[in-house]
Amino acid sequence: YDKIETIRKQLLNSAKELIIEDFGAGSRKGLTKKRKVCEIANSSLKPKKFAQLLFRMINYYQPETILELGTSLGVTSAYLASAKPDATLITMEGSASIASIAKNNLNQLNLKNVRVVEGNFDETLSNTLSNIRQIDFAFLDGNHRYQPTIDYFNQVLEKSTENTIIVIDDVHW
């Protein structure tokens, strides 16, 4: 956990500014075009205890294919990927500038089992799923609006088995 938490601390202290495009429900602070990495980290990163719970779930259930909607800065992605290095993690992020930071963080951790897909889930999820035989574990944490979440869940369900685990985060309907 230590290397990932070091990256979390760096992100929480980063004053670097990004131009972002938010396709989801937006942050609690509202949509803005220019945001500091530390602001994104403060509002979007999963708390350590929840990210580590996901790590333990992956470690226990040993899924082969993991799908994450909502890469953000890559901290939770790092926990998912490091829990089972021989699994494939496909993580999706709407904002190219945020995805770029995530890729850098995942590379820093030398996680080779991750593929980052950039773009609006409405435009990228269907094609991404068409290239996956089945999903063993899905973490839906990207767009928090009701209808898109239901739509994404139903698409993921088509690639699920009776043993698939689907975790939906931040549901506030």
Model-derived regions: residue spans:
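A short alpha-helical cap/connector motif
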Residues: 1-137, 143-167, 171-173
